[in-house]
Amino acid sequence: MKKTFTGVVVSDKADKTVSVKVERRFMHPLYGKVVTRSKKYAAHDEQNEYRIGDRVEIIAVRPISKTKTWKVTRLIERPRGIETTAVETEGGNA
């Protein structure tokens, strides 16, 4: 069974790669407080189809590059009302 995580895409700038932030919550062993920790994983995105804010599932695969050993398997949720176009992302020459 391969490891799978669920996280949010925080960067899609690189070609065929997205950065996925995975958060985990646990009870502190001494103080009993619920603590949140996060880690970013570089995940393979062959078609460049995932955007910032998408909730995705990633799975461990063989090493694709030096830092990339995860692959996006499916889109879980896409935020509503966030559609970017090429004109908006380039910025104008105001």
UniProtKB/Swiss-Prot annotation:
GO molecular function (one): rRNA binding
SUPFAM superfamilies from the UniProt entry: Nucleic acid-binding proteins
UniProt superkingdom: Bacteria
GO-annotated cellular components: cytosolic small ribosomal subunit
Keyword Nucleus: no
UniProt keyword list: Ribonucleoprotein, Ribosomal protein, RNA-binding, rRNA-binding
InterPro entries xrefs: NA-bd_OB-fold, Ribosomal_uS17, Ribosomal_uS17_bact/chlr
Gene Ontology biological process: translation
Sequence similarity: Belongs to the universal ribosomal protein uS17 family.
Record's subunit section: Part of the 30S ribosomal subunit.
PANTHER family to which the protein is assigned, alphabetical: 40S RIBOSOMAL PROTEIN S11 FAMILY MEMBER, SMALL RIBOSOMAL SUBUNIT PROTEIN US17M
Function description: One of the primary rRNA binding proteins, it binds specifically to the 5'-end of 16S ribosomal RNA.
Protein name: Small ribosomal subunit protein uS17
